[in-house]
Amino acid sequence: MAEVHIIGQIIGASGFPQHSLFCKWGLHTGGAWKLLSGVVEGQTQVDHPQNDDMAFWSHPIDMHFATKGLQGWPKLHLQVWHQDTFGRNELYGYSFLHIPSTPGTHTLLSPTWRPLGTWQEQICQMFVGGGPQLKSASLIYGGSDRYRLQTVAMGQVHLELTVILRNFERYGVESS
């Protein structure tokens, strides 16, 4: 079977209204993909930058897949959270990106968004915190339902990923 190695890191995030951020991430693939090694979900530590607009995580990503075809190419979905001084967590944004299908090292920016909610929810969020969240993470990377949501743009997540393709020609899988 053809193999794909995804190696890299979630560098950090910038452009968010508050510091003290962490990221939950996961990788979604189609049914023809088999994980050979690594983990497909995780969470970074909380970073509270003192003098910088960017929270740094340097969280490693290392996965090895076998596949029979390109259908269901991996998608990375991200959730950026803010942790306040009392240890309460508030969702700051969702994001997803397709893992590049070309071999090599890629520097990526993934813009984030969050559901806007009704005006009552927005007022409640200003005073109490929290805010609307998606019921299912599949809406982040899924089909057209995501485009019906009213959202507001948040910051962006910085990533560096290296993609290594192996045995694609041998098994007749064309990636270009």
From Swiss-Prot:
Q: Give a Gene Ontology cellular component term annotated to this protein.
A: ciliary basal body
Keyword Cytoplasm: yes or no?
yes
The UniProt keywords, alphabetically, are:
Cell projection, Cilium, Cilium biogenesis/degradation, Cytoplasm, Cytoskeleton
| InterPro entries from the UniProt entry | C2_B9-type_dom (IPR010796)
Kindly indicate whether the keyword Coiled coil belongs to this entry: no
Give any single GO term for biological process.
cilium assembly
From which domain of life does this come? Eukaryota
Into which family does the record put it? Belongs to the B9D family.
The name on file for this protein is B9 domain-containing protein 2
* Organism annotation: Xenopus laevis
